[in-house]
Amino acid sequence: LSSFVGREREQADIAQRLQSNRLVTLTGPGGSGKTRLALRVAEAMIASYPDGVWLAELTPLSDPALILPTIAAVFGVREMAGRTLLDGLLRHLRDRQTLLVLDNCEHLIEASAQLIETLLRGAPRLRVLATSREPLGHFFLYQ
């Protein structure tokens, strides 16, 4: 692997922004290092999230309806009788101090933004670090 040099200031800035913003989106063109930067930040912040740092990779998804099951699977949440998958995921996340890294949201931007907003509303200790070639709406962007 090549070394990751020269982005320490960006890493520190993003980590600081995650302390005061529940969603930070890294935007930029393909190949600009968004994913690698997000993973470095997440790795550096593991101690800040006692319930874990989790990665959901959206690249292989073509159907927006698959975002929720993909994220739920990352956390080991399954649909159960009497409750929806979303309810189960929110119940799982509600009291957990967790960082979710959502990688490559750009091709499912609307559905990603809507689900992130729902998760943040229902899980007050959740933080999301997203990567996308396009902004995820009105949330904080880091370019």
Predicted features and spans:
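Dynamic helix-loop-helix/coil hinge segments at AAA+ ATPase domain boundaries and subdomain interfaces
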Residues: 1-11, 103
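A short linear-motif detector with a strong N-terminal bias
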Residues: 3-4, 33-37, 78-80, 106-109, ...
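Conserved beta-strand positions that form and line the central face of beta-propeller blades
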Residues: 3-4, 25, 143
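Phenylalanine-focused residue identity feature
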Residues: 4, 71, 75, 139-140
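Post-nucleotide-binding-loop coupling segment downstream of the phosphate-binding loop, primarily
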Residues: 9-32, 36-97
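A conserved switch/coupling segment of P-loop NTPase cores
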Residues: 16-19, 42-50, 86-143
